[in-house]
């Protein structure tokens, strides 16, 4: 999608350029609010978290920010003290150029791990950036944060007079354990810091934290939201609903663009003892290489789903005799379908989005997670990815 001026939140501007970090495409994105924002961020729990994560986590502790720096094609992870110094220098340079206090800036970085930033190029490219800020171009920003993505990822909604927009990137090294790959949300709605924090974290937990491409949690996962309040207050419930819709849209875009992916997998587990159990079982299914390859081959092999459920060894209250497995609405376990239904099941498994539904019949809680199939393309892309 492309945003029009009428669908763009007011009071934001951007500076987007190529600094030569890896190639000739946009690799530096700066998004600024005209006024200080209520803000929140959630980040990777990886033990190898990069300086961008640690700095942003610190800067957002007070629930305020006015700008976000996003660098693509280089994660700046595992570079020791020099990597920390480089990230801090970039924040200081942007602060000097824009007049925003360094502590009111967040930074995110994505790309190859273990390479230092080309800091001389970055220094040169940021000279005069404060005078080059233009009306916010969220479409270009979504393209500028891409690495191995094949399409940009953007979504928007309106609540009353306020607009919300979200951009994200990610196709591999994706099983968020806090937040997401990289995702950024901007709104001109007025909202308190505590309310924003509650809504944002609930949204992330039920969308991005329910996404898995390859079970690998990134060292750079970051999700940040800025709300500048210029459009005034909006109903909290409507704001929360709109934010969740945007996040859900972005999750599906990421799943569709998973490295080598041809299909989205949606797994819903219901009748669980609690939400955590439902989510654990659903994740076990969507993460299974055998389930993923069965989906790729349009093979309705429900035994692989049963296997994935069975791996959840800590869920001692799951009784196989009570479990029901469906592909779409067709029940495959207990095995009640006839041989003539096999073609129908193959049709279901051939869709661009394959729905797997499991009922545990223990309690009342439900969780839905998303992923994609596993193909030769994933191996090819990652086998050739240069360090």
Swiss-Prot record:
User: Can you list the GO cellular component terms from the UniProt entry?
Assistant: cytoplasm
Positions marked as site (Cleavage): 179-180
Localization, per the record, is: Cytoplasm
| GO BP, one annotated term | ornithine biosynthetic process
**What molecular functions are annotated in GO for this chain?**
glutamate N-acetyltransferase activity; L-glutamate N-acetyltransferase activity
**Which catalysed reactions does the entry list for this protein?**
N(2)-acetyl-L-ornithine + L-glutamate = N-acetyl-L-glutamate + L-ornithine; L-glutamate + acetyl-CoA = N-acetyl-L-glutamate + CoA + H(+)
Q: In which pathway does it act?
A: Amino-acid biosynthesis; L-arginine biosynthesis; L-ornithine and N-acetyl-L-glutamate from L-glutamate and N(2)-acetyl-L-ornithine (cyclic): step 1/1; Amino-acid biosynthesis; L-arginine biosynthesis; N(2)-acetyl-L-ornithine from L-glutamate: step 1/4
Q: Zinc as a keyword?
A: no
Statement: the UniProt record of this protein carries the keyword Acyltransferase:
yes
Entry keyword set = Acyltransferase, Amino-acid biosynthesis, Arginine biosynthesis, Autocatalytic cleavage, Cytoplasm, Multifunctional enzyme, Transferase
> Could you say which residues are annotated as the site Involved in the stabilization of negative charge on the oxyanion by the formation of the oxyanion hole?
110-111
Residues where substrate binds: 147, 169, 180, 259, 382, 387
User: Which EC number applies?
Assistant: 2.3.1.35, 2.3.1.1
**Which Pfam families would you find in this protein's record?**
ArgJ
Catalytic residues, per the record, are 180 (nucleophile)
**Which PANTHER family is this protein grouped with?**
ARGININE BIOSYNTHESIS BIFUNCTIONAL PROTEIN ARGJ, ARGININE BIOSYNTHESIS BIFUNCTIONAL PROTEIN ARGJ, MITOCHONDRIAL
Q: What is this protein's function?
A: Catalyzes two activities which are involved in the cyclic version of arginine biosynthesis: the synthesis of N-acetylglutamate from glutamate and acetyl-CoA as the acetyl donor, and of ornithine by transacetylation between N(2)-acetylornithine and glutamate.
Task: Name the family.
Answer: Belongs to the ArgJ family.
Q: Summarize subunit and interaction data from the UniProt record for this chain.
A: Heterotetramer of two alpha and two beta chains.
Q: Which NCBIfam families match?
A: ArgJ, PRK05388.1
The name on file for this protein is Arginine biosynthesis bifunctional protein ArgJ 2
Q: Which organism is it from?
A: Nostoc sp. (strain PCC 7120 / SAG 25.82 / UTEX 2576)
Q: What is the lineage of its organism?
A: Bacteria, Bacillati, Cyanobacteriota, Cyanophyceae, Nostocales
């Amino acid at each position: 999608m492309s945003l029009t001026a009428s669908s763009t939140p007011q009071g934001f501007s951007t500076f987007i350029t190529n600094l030569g970090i890896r190639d000739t495409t946009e690799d530096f994105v700066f998004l600024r609010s005209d006024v200080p924002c209520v803000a929140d961020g959630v980040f990777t729990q990886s033990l190898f978290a990069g300086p961008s994560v640690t700095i942003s986590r610190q800067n957002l502790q007070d629930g305020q920010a006015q700008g976000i720096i996003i660098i693509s094609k280089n994660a700046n992870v595992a570079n020791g003290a020099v990597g920390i110094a480089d990230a801090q220098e970039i924040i200081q340079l942007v602060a000097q150029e824009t007049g925003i206090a360094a502590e009111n800036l967040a930074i995110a970085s994505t790309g190859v791990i273990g390479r230092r930033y080309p800091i001389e190029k970055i220094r040169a490219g940021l000279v005069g950036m404060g005078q080059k800020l233009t009306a916010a171009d969220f479409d270009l920003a979504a393209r500028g944060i891409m690495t191995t993505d094949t399409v940009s990822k953007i979504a928007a909604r309106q609540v009353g007079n306020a607009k919300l927009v979200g951009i994200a990137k990610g196709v591999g090294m994706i099983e968020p354990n806090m937040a997401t790959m990289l995702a950024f949300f901007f709104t001109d709605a007025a909202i308190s810091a505590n309310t924003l924090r509650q809504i944002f974290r609930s949204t992330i937990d039920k969308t991005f934290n329910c996404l898995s491409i390859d079970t690998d949690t990134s060292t750079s996962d970051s999700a940040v939201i800025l709300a500048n309040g210029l459009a005034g207050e909006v109903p909290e419930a409507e704001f929360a609903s709109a934010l969740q819709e945007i996040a859900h849209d972005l999750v599906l875009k990421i799943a569709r663009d998973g490295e080598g992916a041809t299909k989205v997998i949606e797994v819903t587990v219901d009748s669980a003892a609690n939400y955590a159990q439902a989510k654990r079982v659903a994740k076990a299914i969507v993460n299974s290489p055998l389930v993923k390859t069965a989906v790729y081959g349009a093979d309705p092999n429900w035994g692989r789903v049963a296997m994935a459920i069975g791996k959840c060894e800590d869920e001692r209250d799951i009784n196989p005799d009570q479990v029901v497995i469906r592909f779409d609405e067709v029940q495959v376990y207990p095995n009640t379908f006839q041989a003539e239904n096999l073609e129908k099941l193959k049709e279901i498994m051939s869709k661009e989005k394959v729905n797997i539904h499991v009922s545990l019949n223990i309690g009342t809680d439900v969780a839905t997670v998303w992923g994609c199939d596993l193909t030769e393309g994933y191996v090819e892309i990652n086998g050739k990815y240069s360090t």
